[in-house]
């Protein structure tokens, strides 16, 4: 589950009539049609759980939430997600390198 402040943002932005709509005659049981023009989504997560453990123990629920439940409403959006871990044992140098990596990925995915 994302932090509460992020969950609040998602609830405000990803809502019927703004981000998606149900087709006429569909009261919400069908597949919504995306309204947003975004065709690319990038998510960065931090974690104290190694990816291997996340996958084996939990099946990577954050991937499912972000890719399928949230950005899946955009249709065929190019989705990219990267997790940086383990935060609790990381060094300042390692965290600085993560930020450099984030900058490089953003520049690659959203060229100016």
Identify what each model region corresponds to:
Residues 1-66:
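Helix-loop-strand module that forms the ligand-binding subsite of alpha/beta enzymes
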Residues 53-112:
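Glycine-rich phosphate/pyrophosphate-binding loop and the adjoining helix
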């Amino acid at each position: 589950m994302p932090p509460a402040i992020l969950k609040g943002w998602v609830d405000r932005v990803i809502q019927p009539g703004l981000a998606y709509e149900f087709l006429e005659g569909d009261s919400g049981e069908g597949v919504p049609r995306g309204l947003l023009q975004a065709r690319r989504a990038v998510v960065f997560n931090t974690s104290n759980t190694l990816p291997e453990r996340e996958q084996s123990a939990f099946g990577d629920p954050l991937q499912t939430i972000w890719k399928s439940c949230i950005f899946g409403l955009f249709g065929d959006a190019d989705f990219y997600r990267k997790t940086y871990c383990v935060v609790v044992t990381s060094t300042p140098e390692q965290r600085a390198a993560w930020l450099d990596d984030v900058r490089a990925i953003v520049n690659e995915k959203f060229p100016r």
